[in-house]
Amino acid sequence: MAANNRSDHGSDENTRLYNPYQNYEVPINKSQYLYKLPTSPEFLFTEEALRQRRSWGENLTFYTGTAYLGGSVAGASVGVITGVKSFESGDTTKLKINRILNSSGQTGRTWGNRIGIIGLVYAGIESGIVAATDRDDVWTSVVAGLGTGAVCRAARGVRSAAVAGALGGLAAGAVVAGKQIVKRYVPI
């Protein structure tokens, strides 16, 4: 990036001035080393700038990570309750803590892996639908939820896959509707 003169600093309102030497005590004429940096993300094509969507890789990482984290926390909570219920009358405090930690760790890992896989499948189906239709709306999420439920229960038979698909579609629709309600009525 070339250095800019002082005369054209106010010409573009979508930029900010940046001085790379502002934090250093160096004997350099700082006014000639002011650079105009954009304040918004840069895109090669204007169509990319109009889309407010994560890429398929970011989508995959986000949904899988969020699902794994949520499943691990929920599983650890259930594991704590299971560990507390498994106390015996002669257990020492050290043994009780050990039971709680073992139970919460095992259940947290199991739930995290299972729900993380569901997030992975959902993200893959949703990204595939968006790539095929070039649309991202409520129905994309509902169809992705339907497909995720069906894929995750396909090994148990057609009836189980159909029920799980319907539940997945309803769950995805409820989440999207809740997100829209929060955007509209909750001032953030």
From Swiss-Prot:
GO biological process: protein import into mitochondrial matrix
Tissue specificity as recorded in UniProt: Expressed in roots and young cotyledons. Detected in leaves and flowers.
Pfam families on file: Tim17
Segments traversing the membrane: 64-84, 112-131, 138-154, 161-178
Location (main, coarse): mitochondrion
Subcellular location: Mitochondrion inner membrane
Presence of keyword Mitochondrion: yes
Family assignment from sequence similarity: Belongs to the Tim17/Tim22/Tim23 family.
Domain notes: The C-terminal part (143-188) is required for insertion in the mitochondrial inner membrane.
Subunit structure: Homomultimer. Component of the TIM17:23 complex at least composed of TIM23, TIM17 and TIM50. The complex interacts with the TIM44 component of the PAM complex. Also part of the NADH-ubiquinone oxidoreductase complex I. Interacts with OEP163, TIM17-2, TIM21, TIM50 and MPPA2.
Name listed for the protein in its UniProt record: Mitochondrial import inner membrane translocase subunit TIM23-2
Annotated organism of origin: Arabidopsis thaliana
Taxonomic classification: Eukaryota, Viridiplantae, Streptophyta, Embryophyta, Tracheophyta
